[in-house]
């Protein structure tokens, strides 16, 4: 069957073509049965991995030096295990990207990226040349599709033009690490970070001291 079609708002042009014998009529109503077919939408950035602890300027007066004690801790704040294969970690201090291998971060667990993995058993070797700035840097975690999963810009001072901008100070060579207070809240706010109560070096690979039910202090 040869059909000629003329557009409603057009000149004298005609469109010529053939009917497909398998064509079906358009139906404006559709029904679906999830028992037969269903899909589940997942946002491409739904991975709930957060930068949870940063030891960017270890305290040399405690015998902890940058090349041996710098680390970044990631926390899986979701309910599913996540394979980090092909994920990237960027650090503006050195302006390069670290690529993760076939590493699975279980739900509710921690992963340490260490400048010296011998200091932290079970950690990932970040490389001795990949230092963390002692003053300010932007840390970015991207998934295999290069989408940003988490990003933090830490500082050792205050930005008068930004709310919640004063970063904790004892993590700047005072013996504490920089610990996230609430992984469900925006971790790019300085107000969501606190100096670790554990001195020196914080709590790499375990629950943050700021989130612990234990009470830290000294007896009189």
PLM-predicted stretches and their roles:
Residues 1-50, 196-220:
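Primarily marks secretory-pathway-exposed extracellular/lumenal segments that are disulfide-
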Residues 10, 42-189, 196-199, 213-214:
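Activation on beta-sandwich/Ig-like modules and their edge loops
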């Amino acid at each position: 069957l040869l059909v000629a079609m003329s557009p409603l708002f057009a000149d004298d042009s005609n469109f010529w073509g053939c009917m497909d014998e398998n064509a079906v009529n358009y139906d404006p109503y559709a029904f679906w049965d999830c028992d037969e077919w269903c899909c589940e939408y997942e946002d491409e950035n739904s991975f709930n991995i957060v930068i949870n602890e940063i030891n960017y300027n270890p305290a040399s007066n405690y015998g902890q030096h940058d090349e041996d004690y710098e680390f970044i801790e990631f926390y899986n704040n979701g309910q599913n295990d996540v394979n980090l294969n092909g994920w990237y970690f960027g650090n503006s201090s050195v302006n390069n990207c670290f690529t993760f291998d076939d590493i699975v971060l279980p739900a509710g667990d921690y992963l340490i990226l260490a400048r010296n993995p011998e200091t932290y058993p079970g950690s990932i070797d970040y490389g001795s040349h990949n230092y963390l700035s002692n003053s300010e840097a932007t840390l970015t975690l991207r998934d295999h599709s290069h989408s940003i999963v988490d990003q933090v810009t830490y500082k050792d001072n205050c930005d008068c033009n930004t709310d919640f901008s004063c970063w904790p100070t004892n993590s700047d060579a005072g013996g504490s690490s920089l610990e996230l207070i609430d992984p469900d809240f925006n971790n790019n706010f300085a107000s969501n970070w606190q100096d670790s109560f554990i001195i020196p070096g914080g709590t790499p690979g375990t629950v943050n001291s700021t989130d612990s039910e234990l009470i830290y202090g000294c007896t009189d």
